[in-house]
């Protein structure tokens, strides 16, 4: 029985469709470089993020990038992986691996680093198909230092002065005060003496004193005699004397109860002489 053979053009077309750029370059038999891990020494403060960079050039579809930490027994402990390995749910979420946009660099970060995170770290690349290969990077060290509390900046206290210098300062201050007091007394004495001299000079010369706001006012008392001239009174013209009119009444008291005698009247208009009265008639006369 003869096996049918595919025509050559069909085989050529299948080969063209199945080929992609770099397929031969990514051959598993071709040697590839191990990843790089930097920086070699990373020092951070407690509570800050610590970030390493792992660079891997052979990023084919079938690879895994792991992040390791060396244990005290010199064994590798897997912290995180890219792509993320969901088969190990107990991993610490503080350790993260993130691919950068260029596709070859990966950030491996410790979020909020602790003091016990200090140690040795490295990254490892695993190629799965068609043959598994594992290559590790060089090791790097992480140091997490203690965070110190920020002490508020205090103003430097002045250095203590010696006792002799303090006594000198006190003596200087007291001397300055005494000197100021003496100067003030001298100024007041000069002002008062000048004011007194000006007062005496003004009294001697008879000139009025000029007002001095700084001088003490001095009061003087002068005694004199006041002379009032007598002014004679102007004689007034004589006033004509008008004779006063006086009326006289005579009351005659009769001697008997049954007899009566006529009364006599006199006035100033009549004659001045009065008629004689009888002795038996009692009478009293007074001016009206």
UniProtKB/Swiss-Prot annotation:
Topological domains, Extracellular: 25-170
PROSITE patterns recorded: IG_LIKE (PS50835)
Signal peptide start and end residues: 1-24
Any GO BP annotation: positive regulation of T cell apoptotic process
Spans traversing the lipid bilayer: 171-191
Disulfide bonding pattern of the chain: 54-123
Source species of the chain: Homo sapiens
The Ig-like V-type domain, residue ranges: 35-145
Region (Pembrolizumab binding): 74-99
Basic and acidic residues bias locations: 278-288
Gene Ontology cellular component terms for the protein in this record: external side of plasma membrane; plasma membrane
Function: Inhibitory receptor on antigen activated T-cells that plays a critical role in induction and maintenance of immune tolerance to self. Delivers inhibitory signals upon binding to ligands CD274/PDCD1L1 and CD273/PDCD1LG2. Following T-cell receptor (TCR) engagement, PDCD1 associates with CD3-TCR in the immunological synapse and directly inhibits T-cell activation. The PDCD1-mediated inhibitory pathway is exploited by tumors to attenuate anti-tumor immunity and escape destruction by the immune system, thereby facilitating tumor survival. The interaction with CD274/PDCD1L1 inhibits cytotoxic T lymphocytes (CTLs) effector function. The blockage of the PDCD1-mediated pathway results in the reversal of the exhausted T-cell phenotype and the normalization of the anti-tumor response, providing a rationale for cancer immunotherapy.
CDD domains: IgV_PD1 (cd16088)
Keyword check for Ubl conjugation: yes
Start and end residues of each stretch annotated as Interaction with CD274/PDCD1L1: 70-77
Name of the molecule in the record: Programmed cell death protein 1
Motif ITSM motif location, chain numbering: 247-251
Activity regulation summary: Inhibited by pembrolizumab (also named MK-3475 or lambrolizumab), a monoclonal antibody that prevents the interaction with CD274/PDCD1L1. Inhibited by nivolumab (also named ONO-4538, BMS-936558 or Opdivo), a monoclonal antibody that prevents the interaction with CD274/PDCD1L1. The interaction with nivolumab is not dependent on glycosylation and depends on a loop at the N-terminus (N-terminal loop, corresponding to residues 25-34).
Quaternary context: Monomer. Interacts with CD274/PDCD1L1. Interacts with CD273/PDCD1LG2. Interacts with FBXO38; leading to ubiquitination and degradation of PDCD1 by the proteasome.
